[in-house]
Amino acid sequence: MTAPLAGLRWGLGPGWLLRLKRCRRSAPWDLGIRSSASRKELLGLFSLNNDILSQSCRNYQAVLCTELTKPLIIRNLPSPSLQPHEVRVGVHYCGVNFADILACKGLYQEKHCLPFTPGMEFSGMVMETGANVSTVQEMLWPIPEGVSYEEAAALPVSYGTAILALDHRARTQPEETVLVTAAAGATGLAAIDVAANVLKAKVIAAAGSDYKCNLALQKGAAHSVNYTQGSLKEGVKKLTDNRGVNVVLDAVGGDIFKEALHSLAWEGRIVVVGFAGGAIPSVPANLLLLKNVSALGVFWGRYREEDFPVFSSSLSSALWHCQERRIQPHVGAVFKLEEVNEAFSRVTQRKSTGKVVISMK
């Protein structure tokens, strides 16, 4: 009997232990078994196969950050014993996120004690369940039929963020105009996908090259602006007949955020999901007043602690929309585990489009 499942945690590797209660950030990039009540916020997708429950791993490979700002290393570690409230997971794919890179530089909001295994999302197979596990509620989600392991690993962080930002926070309505910055990144393409194909909004994509703008158009954006070739604000004004946009999803920060904020229409909403540009901007309160606009934030992982039903719903919705083919995650590159540092460099150097994933197989 096989039942597809999906789950959440932090780490890089093919199989690990997952404690079925809310934990502190841990990582999916362990190539064996991993779980710790001292970590939080891991996302992934699995399928349960009772035919292999007799299998156990004596050792596993794990990606470790042993020194901040230094290359990651891979080590063979002994597998811990399966505890009553844990499941053993064989990981197939892991997603790479900008937050992982920040964590390995010591720049992320949540700090980790060295050494730690980075990572936030994965897909794989449940290999074994602890004696007290009767159902999976807070860490694992079913992978629907027709959704691949590769697609599943690309969904949680990017699409969970996009759904929360555009639907739950900004309350985006059909036919509204949505501006997406960093449009060719993982969250940007997910936001375009959700806005255009689920919420039926009109999307303006903003990116830093013609190639990235063209990719955003292929993925559902109605228009694009290359903000390295002119003013984002002026580009949006031309595309909207000076009306501005109803919603902005910004992952860049800095000057791009400021231009996007000035591009809002009356009663517009700007949702901050990150600061990939490095600079954290301030918000001029007089502009909020004059245009009656709202500035909102989304830290998707925090919802797991503060409002778990909303958190879980965002991931379940992403999986369902993917099964129905309303959305389709864009995997821009696949790396092997031993190429993890190259994968990090691809994201850091802005060479990637969509989601970068690590294959454990």
Give the location of each predicted region.
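Residues located in well-ordered beta-strands
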Residues: 61, 73, 78, 90, ...
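N-terminal mitochondrial targeting presequence
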Residues: 1-60
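Mid-domain Rossmann-like dinucleotide-binding core that forms the NAD(H)/NADP(H) cofactor-binding site
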Residues: 150-230, 235
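Glycine-rich phosphate-binding loop and adjacent beta-alpha segment
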Residues: 199-200, 207, 255-327, 352, ...
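C-terminal hydrophobic helical "lid"/dimerization subdomain
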Residues: 2, 7, 26, 40, ...
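N-terminal Rossmann-like NAD(P) cofactor-binding module of classical short-chain dehydrogenase/reductase
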Residues: 179, 248-249
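Glycine-rich beta-strand-centered segment in the early N-terminal region that forms part
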Residues: 78-96, 107-138
